[in-house]
Design a protein with these regions (language model features):
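Sequence-level preference for short, compositionally simple segments enriched
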Residues: 2, 6, 11-60, 68-79, ...
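Short alpha-helix capping/helix-loop boundary micro-motifs
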Residues: 70-77, 160-167, 252
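Short, well-ordered loop/turn sites that connect or cap secondary structure elements
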Residues: 83, 152, 165-172, 177, ...
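Short conserved beta-strand and strand-loop elements enriched in small hydrophobics
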Residues: 87-93, 177-179, 206-207
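Generic structural signal for buried aliphatic residues
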Residues: 89, 158, 171-178, 225
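Short, Lys/Arg- and Gly-enriched loop/turn segments at beta-strand edges
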Residues: 98-102, 168, 181-191, 197
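Long beta-strand-rich cores associated with HINT superfamily self-processing modules
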Residues: 146, 153-161, 190-295
Length: 343
């Protein structure tokens, strides 16, 4: 049976943001001003990303009541400061598809604005004009939560309790799915979102045969897979490792699939489980203060105790804090480790 991961690191979410001063109005009512809070924004203003600007990693965590905080080891912001999601905006570029973004506000101890950040939900190009065509206070928290949700893509075959396979889009609430450690478990909720497959929203493709899978597996980049290797690489007494899909990318048989749109599906159970997708052991949705906003409000109202049962599974050593964050390239595991894990 799965147990909560002992001494687990605080659950965090990492997003790539630009300081407000990197994204300023080049033409319009607020010419020269940086992106700001919703009351200061004027529709039809044209913004531009300054040349040479690169996004910074902002690490977030959340209290039980949902209040967002800036976590330690963040590239920007003050650790422990409150973070407010001010609004959701839509930008229309001079060339290409619209880009949504979330305006985030860091608040100091006096309740005053300490900093403003823009979290673009698709890459921004420097020296390109972006016209502000929409601003709203609604939906920002849900969009942020969707970024944190681990997701499978349309067509992914999920193993049911009786051993048969079913495409994820054909699953229904109440269906019994096979879990690695707790037998058959009923699906409590199924989420579905369609998004542009670009940047951090682009899925990772694991080719057939890489991990004993007969078919390709396409899933969200932060989705953790349970990978077994004969050697205990960290001498911690475990040969099973939970590894993010993005950390297995090697440019060959595990790649990022950018371009077009992708249909993402999330599976929620009473607890966090390891299930089987295309035969590969992978985690289900972990419901925590960062991801629960992705669920409909009425679902949480009817299941008030659901969040209490969700803690990270301890089926294997979680590579993310142990190895990935010690690597010189935290976004990707060393090639030697990737090769060993895939044996």
């Amino acid at each position: 049976m799965l147990t909560p991961l002992q001494n687990a690191a605080q659950i965090t979410q990492t997003v790539a943001v630009f300081p407000a001063t990197s994204f300023c109005v080049e033409m319009g009512a607020n010419t020269g001003d940086p992106i700001g809070v919703i009351d200061d924004l004027a529709l039809d203003d044209v913004y531009q990303l300054a040349s040479g600007q690169r996004p910074k990693e902002l690490r977030l965590t959340a209290r039980a009541d949902g209040q967002l905080l800036i976590a330690g080891n963040s590239d920007t912001g003050s650790a422990g400061a409150h973070l407010h999601l001010d609004c959701l905006i839509t930008l229309m570029p001079d060339v290409g598809a619209n880009v949504d973004g979330i305006v985030m506000v860091e608040v100091d101890n006096a309740g005053m604005i300490a900093a403003v950040y823009l979290l673009p939900l698709a890459p921004l190009e420097p020296q390109l004009g972006y016209t502000l065509v929409r601003k709203t206070r609604d939906g920002a928290r849900r969009r942020l939560a969707q970024l944190a949700c681990v997701s499978f893509t349309r067509g992914t075959q999920i193993t049911l309790a009786n051993g048969t396979l079913r495409p994820i889009e054909e699953l229904q609430v109440g269906d019994r799915v096979l879990t690695r450690d707790d037998g058959a478990q009923r699906v409590r909720w199924i989420g579905q979102t369609t998004t542009r497959a670009i940047g951090d929203l682009a899925p990772v493709l694991i080719r057939a045969g890489v991990h004993g899978n007969e078919r390709d597996l396409l899933l969200s980049p932060d989705h953790r897979l349970l990978v077994h290797n004969r050697r205990d690489l960290h001498r911690l007494g475990r040969a099973d490792h939970l590894v993010r899909a993005r950390d297995l990318v090697n440019g060959g048989d595990v790649t990022v699939q950018s371009g077009g749109f992708v249909d993402y599906f999330q599976l929620l159970f009473d607890r966090h489980h390891i299930i089987f997708a295309e035969g590969i052991a992978a985690e289900s949705l972990l419901l925590d203060p960062l991801t629960r906003a992705a669920l409909p409000d009425d679902h949480m109202a009817h299941s008030p105790g659901l969040l209490m049962g969700h803690q990270r599974v301890a089926s294997g050593l979680d590579i993310r804090p142990v190895a990935a964050e010690r690597s010189a390239q935290a976004s990707q595991l060393p090639s030697q480790l990737r090769r060993a894990l895939m044996r």
